[in-house]
Amino acid sequence: MKSGGEMTREFVMIPEFDKQWKAIGFTDKELKALQEELTINPIKGDLIQGTGGLRKIRVAFEGRGKSGSARVCYVDFAVYERIYLITAYTKNSKDNLTKQERNEIKRLIDILKDSQARR
């Protein structure tokens, strides 16, 4: 946390997220806006049960509103002031993560938690 109580976060995009973000067509400007939004309120997204802390947030395409939106899933490690951007997908490609995807992401989050604790 910065002096004056302002929250800070380092953002880490896993390679799969980076590919998905670009494939959806989001811009660097939209990524910066997402990062600013999550820095202000890192627990904004809905918590996805059984994933070890994954959250899902709606992200609107510029000029198309929330109806033409995507979902970004991330995990916030507040203690380490780090947010991992895990996955992104369009609303029309799927509504939610599958059970298998949630299980895989939980394993990834467990590995990330372990690696953070060792730093």
Predicted regions mapped to residue ranges:
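Arg/Lys-rich, positively charged N-terminal/basic patches that mediate binding to nucleic acids
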Residues: M1-E30
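Preference for short coil/turn "hinge" residues that link or interrupt alpha-helices
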Residues: G5, K19, I40-N41, D76, ...
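A generic structural signal for short beta-strands and their flanking turns/coil linkers
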Residues: M13, L34, G53-R55
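Compact soluble domain cores
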Residues: E16, G25-D46
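Short helix-to-loop capping/linker segments positioned immediately adjacent to catalytic or ligand/cofactor-binding
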Residues: K22, G45, A117-R118
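Basic/aromatic recognition patch in beta-strand/loop cores that engages polyanionic ligands
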Residues: K44-A88, S93
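Enriched for short, Lys/Arg-rich terminal
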Residues: D76-R119
